[in-house]
Each structure stands twice: as structure tokens, then as C-alpha cells.
């Protein structure tokens, strides 16, 4: 905002005379928002106190004074910063009462017009400020609705997916534990299978040994049967031979009996042969019974061993089948668990990639929102600074209005004398000259050419 005070020369149609004074107010520029008026039209307050000149206040002409005014008894005092208000207003013997009232009215009208323009400008600036605040509020709401969407649903989805991931991790850990347990059980079953296999090999070796014993016993039985047959044949041959010998002996003894009877008594050969036959038959029966008992004992032992071995073999075979079924089931379950583990790992990797991409997008969106927020903050700070500048302008203008009001009140207080009616006090004690109170030290024709400016 720029405000400058300067004293300018009279406009066309106004000539300066000795003792004339100019009061001019330069344009007051108020910097505002784009689209607002940048400048207020310049207004000049000109008052020329001369006998033959016209006086203008702003652009309003005042008529010539109708009275012949004597020279003033005071030196005109310009106000600080400008050559304000006509120099002879409020000075003893300057004008008549009607002329002073006309100047006061014109000055008040000018100041009222300027105050009205200022108030209109302030109202316009306040209205524009309210419009800008409403626009900023709408833009902030629009940014909040478009740039800052509601992420609560995404947060709920992320929490649900995190819970699912945790559940999947727990399930994966449980499956890993089950797989480890299954591996340990499979190792135990493998060890048991190896032990059963070694036991089976031992049983098969025992079976082979028992089979060999059985074969040997069968061979021994066959040998014994062959020996029995040979003994039977030998017995038959011995019987036949014995009968033949008996016949021969009987035939021989028949002839010798007579001789022996004649000589001495003979031995009973039938009894001896019967005893020998009985002894041989007892020996054969004993040997046969012993061989049969040994054979039966061996056969029973071998059959018992064979039965026990067959039962153990069946038990081992059934256990082997059960173990094979268990191993196959565990292998199938292990393959299924491996497949499930691979699927879960793939789904976990996909979920991590997807959520990583979404997280990157959200981070980029958050960074964009932060940038927009920083821009909005910068705009708010800039507008706040502009608002502070406008408040400063308003304060300075209010101070200026107060200064004008004080000047008017002070000028009103300085008008006690009437040039047409001479009071005794003015005759006896004329007004003393006043000291200079402003930057201007002389008031004459050169006062209209001096210029003083200030910017704030």
C-alpha cells in the first residue's frame, strides 16, 4: 500500500498571489486483491486566500470573498507533512463569518466524501476478504474431499489382510511343525521297518536252516525207511535162510538123531532158534520204536518250528503291509503339505508384492497431499500477510482520519475572532505570531511547489 502527501501547484484557472496557500492531498493507493480498484481518484484540497482569486476545495469552486480583508496578524502554519487547510482559516481578521462557514462546510464535505470513499473501500475489501475466505474454505473442503479421501476402509482392509497374513503364518508354522512331526514319525517307521526287515531276514534264515533240517530229516527218514526195508528184506532172507537151514538141519538131525540118540541126548535147536528169533525180534522192535520216536520227535519239532516261523512270517508280512500303507499315506500327505506350503508361499509373496505396491501408492499419495498441504499453508500465510498489510493500511487510514478530525477540531478552536466586529481584546492585545509547526518554514508562492512524500 502506498500513501503519499505532496503539495502541488494550483490547477488551471487559479493564480497564486502573495499570501496564498495551497492544501492538497495526494492519491492514496490501496493495494488489494486482484480485481479490486488499485487507486482512489486524487482529491485536492486547495484554499487560496487572495483578494482577487477563486478558491477551490477539491474540484468545487468557491466564490470570491465579498469583504475587503485586512492583512493577517499571524503567519500561516502548515501542518506536518502537507500544506493543509487554507492559511487564513482560524486567523484573526482573515474572513468574515459567512466565508469561514463556507470553507468549513466545504472542508467537512470533502473529508466526509473521502471518509465515505474510504469506508466504501473498507467495506468492499471486507466483502472481498469474506469472498476469498469462502472461496478458500470451499477449496479446502474440495481438497479435503478430492485429495484427502477416507482411508478408513483401506485401513480396515489392511488390518483384515494383516490378520489373514498372521493366521496364514500361524497355519504355516503349524503345518511346518506337523511336517516335522511327520518326518520324525516317518524316520521312526523307517527305523522300525529296517529292524523288522532285519528280523525278517533272520526269520528267513532260520526258516532256511529249518528247511534244511527238514530236508535232512526227510532224507534221514528216507534212509531209515530204506534201512527198514532192507532190514525187512534181510529179515525175510534170514527167515528163508533159517527155514532152509532148519530144514537142512532137520534133515541132517534126523539122520544124526538116531545116532546121537544112540550115543547121547541132543540140544533142543528149536528152543535155541526161538530164543534167538525172540531176541532178534525184540532188538528189531526196540530199534524200530526208537527210530520212530526220534523221527516223530524230530518231525514234531520241525513242524512246530515251521508253524511258529510261518506265524511270525505272516505277522511280519502283515506289519510290513501296514507299514507300507502308512508310508504311502505319509508320503501322499507330505506331498500334499509340500504343495500347500508352496501355494501359501506363493500367495504370501503375491500379497506382499501387492501390499508393497499399494503402500508405495499410498505413500506417494500422502506425499502429494503433504505437498498440497504445504502449498495451502503457504497460501494461507501469504493471505495472512496480505490481511495483516490491509489491517496495517486500515489502521494507518484510521490514524489519518483521526489526524484530520483533530486538525479540524483544532482549527475550529482557533476561530474566536470576527474581522468585521473588532473586539477590545484584539485591539488591545493583537494576536502574536505562531511558530512554524511543520516542515514548511515559509508560506508563499513557493509553498505550492514543495513536495513531501512518504510510503508505508
From Swiss-Prot:
* UniProt cross-references to Pfam families, sorted A to Z: Filament
Q: Where is this region: Coil 1B?
A: 151-251
**Region of interest (Coil 1A), residue spans:** 105-139
Give the region (Tail) as residue ranges.
Answer: 412-456
Q: Where is this region: Head?
A: 1-104
> Any idea which UniProt keywords this protein has?
Coiled coil, Intermediate filament, Keratin
- Residues in IF rod domain copies: 104-415
What family does the Swiss-Prot or TrEMBL record give for this protein?
A: Belongs to the intermediate filament family.
Q: What is this protein called?
A: Keratin, type I cuticular Ha8
Amino acid at each position: 500500500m502506498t500513501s503519499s502527501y505532496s503539495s502541488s501547484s494550483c490547477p488551471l484557472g487559479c493564480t497564486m498571489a502573495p499570501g496564498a496557500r495551497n492544501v492538497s492531498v495526494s492519491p492514496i493507493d490501496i493495494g488489494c486483491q486482484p480485481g479490486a480498484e488499485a487507486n482512489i481518484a486524487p482529491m485536492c484540497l486547495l484554499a487560496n486566500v487572495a483578494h482577487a482569486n477563486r478558491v477551490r476545495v477539491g474540484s468545487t469552486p468557491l466564490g470570491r470573498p465579498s469583504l475587503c480583508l485586512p492583512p493577517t496578524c499571524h503567519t500561516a502554519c502548515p501542518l506536518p507533512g502537507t500544506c493543509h487547510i487554507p492559511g487564513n482559516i482560524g486567523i484573526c481578521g482573515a474572513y468574515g463569518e459567512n466565508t469561514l462557514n463556507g470553507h468549513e462546510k466545504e472542508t467537512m464535505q470533502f473529508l466526509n466524501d473521502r471518509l465515505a470513499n474510504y469506508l466504501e473501500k473498507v467495506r468492499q475489501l471486507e466483502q472481498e476478504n469474506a469472498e476469498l475466505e469462502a472461496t478458500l474454505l470451499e477449496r479446502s473442503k474440495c481438497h479435503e474431499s478430492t485429495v484427502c479421501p477416507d482411508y478408513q476402509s483401506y485401513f480396515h482392509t489392511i488390518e483384515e489382510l494383516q490378520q489373514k497374513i498372521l493366521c496364514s503364518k500361524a497355519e504355516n508354522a503349524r503345518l511346518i511343525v506337523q511336517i516335522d512331526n511327520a518326518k520324525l514319525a516317518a524316520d521312526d517307521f523307517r527305523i522300525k521297518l529296517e529292524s523288522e526287515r532285519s528280523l525278517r531276514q533272520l526269520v528267513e534264515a532260520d526258516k532256511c536252516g529249518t528247511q534244511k533240517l527238514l530236508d535232512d530229516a526227510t532224507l534221514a527218514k528216507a534212509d531209515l525207511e530204506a534201512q527198514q526195508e532192507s532190514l525187512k528184506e534181510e529179515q525175510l532172507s534170514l527167515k528163508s535162510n533159517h527155514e532152509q537151514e532148519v530144514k537142512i538141519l532137520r534133515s541132517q538131525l534126523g539122520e544124526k538123531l538116531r545116532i546121537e540118540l544112540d550115543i547121547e541126548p541132543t540140544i533142543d535147536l528149536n528152543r535155541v532158534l526161538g530164543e534167538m528169533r525172540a531176541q532178534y525180534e525184540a532188538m528189531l522192535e526196540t530199534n524200530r520204536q526208537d527210530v520212530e520216536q526220534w523221527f516223530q520227535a524230530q518231525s514234531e519239532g520241525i513242524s512246530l518250528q515251521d508253524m511258529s516261523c510261518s506265524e511270525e512270517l505272516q505277522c511280519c508280512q502283515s506289519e510290513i503291509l501296514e507299514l507300507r500303507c502308512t508310508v504311502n499315506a505319509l508320503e501322499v500327505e507330505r506331498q500334499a503339505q509340500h504343495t500347500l506350503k508352496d501355494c501359501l508361499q506363493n500367495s504370501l509373496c503375491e500379497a506382499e508384492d501387492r501390499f508393497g505396491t499399494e503402500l508405495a501408492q499410498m505413500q506417494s499419495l500422502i506425499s502429494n497431499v503433504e505437498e498440497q498441504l504445504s502449498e495451502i499453508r503457504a497460501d494461507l500465510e501469504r493471505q495472512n500477510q496480505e490481511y495483516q498489510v490491509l489491517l496495517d493500511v486500515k489502521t494507518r487510514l484510521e490514524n489519518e482520519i483521526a489526524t484530520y478530525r483533530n486538525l479540524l477540531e483544532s482549527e475550529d478552536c482557533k476561530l474566536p475572532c470576527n474581522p468585521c466586529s473588532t473586539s477590545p481584546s484584539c485591539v488591545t492585545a493583537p494576536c502574536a505570531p505562531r511558530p512554524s509547526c511543520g516542515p514548511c518554514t515559509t508560506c508563499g508562492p513557493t509553498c505550492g511547489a514543495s513536495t513531501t512524500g512518504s510510503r508505508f
